[in-house]
């Protein structure tokens, strides 16, 4: 604990940070020394007019707590940190946690002020996997330093490590680049969250807004067209194969009928010297609308040297015609 604040030692004095990446300590300057600092140029510890704190190897000087200033009638006023600043937030029962100052998606601002117009709270998106957000008192929010040593974290160690690693990566980024990382603070996310679901009194979810982008239907159409084409080709091939089989069977039956007709049309009356009998000749003529005319059951013909009744030939021909009709009816 440093000297008592009532000594006016800290009144009107200015804190300046050393820009040496291996130091980044804050030094307390007198009004005269602070007036000599050029804001557009980097400042280092060796430029400090106070020899006690003019080296990067010297620790930061102690500074009284805010409560001590309040007890002695002083008001602690915090300078406003810019939007997108990488900060370190003091938490209760947790180690100091890195975060980014970003706008509240509902209020649209990242800082609030008290009645006197001084900074009161900041909206912080805490880093790590996963991110989280909260409004924090300005008294607990300060600049993040690369010299920060990882504190002992008794719970959620992996979460804490991921937060520090992300902070180190974002340290050299611009404020705009850091704000791009703040996924929980996007204005459109607030609208999405408020319309995410409509729930009935019984707690049954009746509708949801699908925030995912719809997949293009072009590929589906192409896939359906290709599938339809392949099915049509398969069906046409199958039908063609079946048609060829039917045609082949029909041709076989027609050849058989043609052979039988040729045998019927040949003159069957032959001279039988031993018996003197003459067989009657069948001469089929095809009337309109019927492939064959009627035959007498008692007539005889001689195909291939065997004697058969004409009625049996008619029955064979009729059966073959029925088979042809059955094959044709399939189409």
Curated annotation (Swiss-Prot):
A zinc finger (CW-type) spans 9-64. Keywords: Metal-binding, Zinc, Zinc-finger. Zn(2+) binds at residues 18, 23, 45, 56. Residues 264-295 are annotated as: Disordered. It comes from the Eukaryota. The keyword Zinc applies. The keyword Metal-binding applies. One of its GO terms (molecular function) is zinc ion binding. Residues 276-293 have a biased composition (Polar residues). Residues 83-147 form the PWWP domain. It holds the Pfam family zf-CW. The CW-TYPE zinc finger mediates its binding to trimethylated histone H3K4me3. Histone methylation reader which binds to non-methylated (H3K4me0), monomethylated (H3K4me1), dimethylated (H3K4me2) and trimethylated (H3K4me3) 'Lys-4' on histone H3. The order of binding preference is H3K4me3 > H3K4me2 > H3K4me1 > H3K4me0. This is Zinc finger CW-type PWWP domain protein 2 homolog. The lineage of its organism: Eukaryota, Metazoa, Chordata, Craniata, Vertebrata. The gene is Zcwpw2.
């Amino acid at each position: 604990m440093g000297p008592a604040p009532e000594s006016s030692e800290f009144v009107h004095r200015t804190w300046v940070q050393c820009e040496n990446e291996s130091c980044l300590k804050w030094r307390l300057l007198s009004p005269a020394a602070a007036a000599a600092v050029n804001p557009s140029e980097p400042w280092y510890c060796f430029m400090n007019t106070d020899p006690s704190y003019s080296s990067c190897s010297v620790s930061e000087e102690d500074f009284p707590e805010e409560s001590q200033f309040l007890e002695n009638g002083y008001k602690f006023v915090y300078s406003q940190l810019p939007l997108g600043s990488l900060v370190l937030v003091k938490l209760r029962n947790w180690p100091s946690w890195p975060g980014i100052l970003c706008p509240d998606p509902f209020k649209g601002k990242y800082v609030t002020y008290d009645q006197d117009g001084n900074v009161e709270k900041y909206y912080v998106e805490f880093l790590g996997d996963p991110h989280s957000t909260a409004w924090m008192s300005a008294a607990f929010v300060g600049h993040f330093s690369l010299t920060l040593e990882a504190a002992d974290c008794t719970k959620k160690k992996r979460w804490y490590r991921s937060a520090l690693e992300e902070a180190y990566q974002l340290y050299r980024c611009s404020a705009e680049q850091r704000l791009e990382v703040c996924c929980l603070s996007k204005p459109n996310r607030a609208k999405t969250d408020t319309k995410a679901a409509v729930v009935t009194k019984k707690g049954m979810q009746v509708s949801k807004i699908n925030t995912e982008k719809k997949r293009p239907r072009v590929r589906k159409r192409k896939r359906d067209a290709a599938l339809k084409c392949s099915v049509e080709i398969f069906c046409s091939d199958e039908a063609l194969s079946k048609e060829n089989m039917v045609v082949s069977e029909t041709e076989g039956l027609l050849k058989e009928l043609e052979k039988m007709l040729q045998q019927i049309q040949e003159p069957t009356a032959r001279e039988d010297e031993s018996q003197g009998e003459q067989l009657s000749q069948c001469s089929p003529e095809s009337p309109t609308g019927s492939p064959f005319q009627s035959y007498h059951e008692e007539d005889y013909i001689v195909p291939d040297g065997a004697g058969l009744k004409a009625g049996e030939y008619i029955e064979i021909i009729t059966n073959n015609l029925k088979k042809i009709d059955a094959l044709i009816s399939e189409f």
